[in-house]
């Protein structure tokens, strides 16, 4: 019995270092918010200006890797001997569900405003050219390119899961073919896992930092409760308590049902916006934007703006590539686990087509609605952001739709459920990654899950206290730097092992 407890307890070497590092950073930030903002700006400037090119080349190289998988020697290889666990329709729906987080709702509604007001390529702000390119850049940042990079890593993890029959709960487990078992299970592997966990904690904290203001702004609109930092903290605390109750009382089935409700409600809300906002304009704008994307794609791929130094690629493209990098392992593990029995080509094509369709629908519908409201002078986004913050501006893009009360209730429920499932997923992923061998069908310890959800909540509150988008962007970019190298090592390890062990 004692031995069993030891196995399912925490793994000290990957539990305490991330906890201590993140705790110290949060304490230093809260101690002096002004000084923290100075450091944040310096870190953001250094990483994006000095190393931004590396993120851009990483995405391009991974895209070529996708083509190699689809048309190369492993294209027809099957990931496991069993038939696919899910039907193709269910498989694609599960992919779509993974895209409907509150953070996605945040960016989908407001991103186009930033692209139009501070456009790339030296275009005039709010000009016709800026508007024509606005949605095209969203389709670039949330389109086939990043999903192609995820599909490569998903194939790698699916190979380790279903072909090599490895238990992978941390990235170091996949590095045995590359660095050897001694190093993968030793200090080197521990460092890799700690980099992964620290980055993942900050990524989840930033997602919570984006999601919470949407819920509190909805509460202000619906109930007249003023949006304050204290209310944000109370809401995050309520989510943590709700998550603890769900875990303690065995209500995980309820959480899964909530996740399904989130997906169906997302379809309903997007359909409503599409119909009442202007279906004809949305389809025309999308079609034109695809053409703009194809025309400007080479420039977008390698745009670093070293001469004019306008800051657009650093503030957006590098930021988003770091965002994709930081979530790559967690997301790829999930996508790999639902893809058992599929061929490499099927997984690569299914992910790129299915997930691109999901994100393109979200960004096209929400972005087009925002542009229409701006052009018709129904809402003044710059004034809303200056006076009340970004979250209020997003809420107003929904409140401006017909049947505003019903629409706002739908959006409120969607954001609330999305964040509940986010907190649950955060605590589960971190607990699984910091515990000793939790077997299939078992749950990580309750206190560990609650502890991680509290820490993620604290990070969300700290980022909200700092104010603005820059702290959130910096947290993502800083976390993406070490995972940039971890993702490359996982990729190389897969290529090396497959070459030796995945033959006809």
UniProtKB/Swiss-Prot annotation:
Pathway in which the depicted protein is active: Amine and polyamine metabolism; carnitine metabolism
The regions listed as transmembrane in this protein's record are 10-30, 51-71, 92-112, 143-163, 195-215, 231-251, 263-283, 316-336, 347-367, 398-418, 446-466, 475-495
Look up keyword Cell inner membrane and say if it applies: yes
Classification via PROSITE patterns: BCCT (PS01303)
Q: Name one GO cellular component term.
A: plasma membrane
Tell me which Gene Ontology terms the entry assigns under biological process: 4-(trimethylammonio)butanoate transport; carnitine metabolic process
Question: Subunit structure of this entry?
Answer: Homotrimer.
Family named by the database record: Belongs to the BCCT transporter (TC 2.A.15) family. CaiT subfamily.
- Supply the name of the protein: L-carnitine/gamma-butyrobetaine antiporter
List the source organism: Escherichia coli (strain SE11)
